[in-house]
Amino acid sequence: MNIFNIIIIGAGHSGIEAAISASKICNKIKIITSNLENLGIMSCNPSIGGIGKSHLVKELELFGGIMPEASDYSRIHSKLLNYKKGESVHSLRYQIDRILYKNYILKILFLKKNILIEQNEINKIIRFKKKILIFNKLKFFNIAKIIIVCAGTFINSKIYIGKNIKALNKAEKKSISYSFKKINLFISKLKTGTPPRLDLNYLNYKKLSVQYSDYTISYGKNFNFNNNVKCFITNTDNKINNFIKKNIKNSSLFNLKFKSIGPRYCPSIEDKIFKFPNNKNHQIFLEPESYFSKEIYVNGLSNSLSYNIQKKLIKKILGIKKSYIIRYAYNIQYDYFDPRCLKISLNIKFANNIFLAGQINGTTGYEEASSQGFVAGINSARKILKLPLWKPKKWNSYIGVLLYDLTNFGIQEPYRIFTSKSDNRLFLRFDNAIFRLINISYYLGCLPIVKFKYYNSLIYKFYKNLINIRKIKLFDNFYLFKLIIIMSKYYGYIKKKYFK
């Protein structure tokens, strides 16, 4: 029987990041997923970045993560957020071509010779003599020294559309929850939702506001210059709000009285109307999903209304009245594990050879999932090699802030990173990630020597120009000049905070 060093259950954003990071320093890695077609898929909003989230992606870029590289390759629309505010809250947001993104992920993953991929359904997980047995539906089993569970929102989950309920009764998903109950892991429920997708060929563009792309910086590799796709904006009005109120009985969110909590910063349209009754208009962003698809993502219209009500709702919104629904909106309720049972290295406190990463830890968003996947992957590989595990610090990275909050305070709602979550946000900026994390990345074995030397040459140039600041030519060294101005701006704070 072949014994694997690491087996990763689930191949979403956290699972793929875990596999890529572990494969840098370790061999004999296996990914088990129930559907190979969904490898690297963006199941909800096709966007990466945002306030706080882009800081995580930039940190992943320095650690050799796959998400920043794939998002730079597949971006079709870019926005620089908070540009008029201080540099510490400047954030980058990409609209992603979901097909290009998935294909790039698959290309990188299939080129890795030390990663095996298997499509299978898991029935049972058993710990036995410092090993883990993973049984599939055919009653065969894999043996692993370490497993990383990255099952996302698909553990014991149910989909709700109006009064219709569809349980995802795949043996793999349900048994993971049951297997972990046996080791006294606290399990509870969360929910999330997704809006409908429309046919963009039937939009009335004359009645929509246009949102143009910014030609901004990239996370790392600026090799996609086709980020010129337009997004569009429309609004609800009083008539639409009243229509939803009248048909609220057809919403599973209110009709079935959910006890689980959804993400605060991504509420459904029903939630918005009842929680903010004085708001007559709620913005709706229409975001194209791909160059190769006619689907458009209706950001801001997440709901769990019935099929017929969703059709009628679309017919009442300005600019999309004549469009057709390609995919309907729905809510999904799923199990998550209390992250306080984890060490900051993301292995379970009382089961050191089991790591948990992604939305099963109570987070929301691709960026948070990928960050956890990276930490779980690199630490599982270091554990195999009997090296000390990496414990991210909250004072020098947003990854540290994320894991510190999860493992110390747990969650009351799906956790989303923000710059406001960090006490040191003036120091943890998008522009100085190289200075903060380059040595850690090289120490962990994530950064090739060539790239390490390149980044060090940039740092050397920066300090050399800092000494000769009067001789700098603005247009020849604009990036360095800007960086010097920013760092001098925050010098007093950093000196007071860190060099008392």
From Swiss-Prot:
FAD binds at residues 10-15. NAD(+) binds at residues 262-276. Belongs to the MnmG family. The gene is mnmG. GO terms for biological process: tRNA methylation; tRNA wobble uridine modification. InterPro entries: FAD/NAD-bd_sf (IPR036188), MnmG-rel (IPR002218), MnmG-rel_CS (IPR020595), MnmG_N (IPR040131). It comes from the Bacteria. The keyword Nucleotide-binding does not apply. It comes from Carsonella ruddii (strain PV). GO terms for cellular component: cytosol. This is tRNA uridine 5-carboxymethylaminomethyl modification enzyme MnmG. It is found in: Cytoplasm.
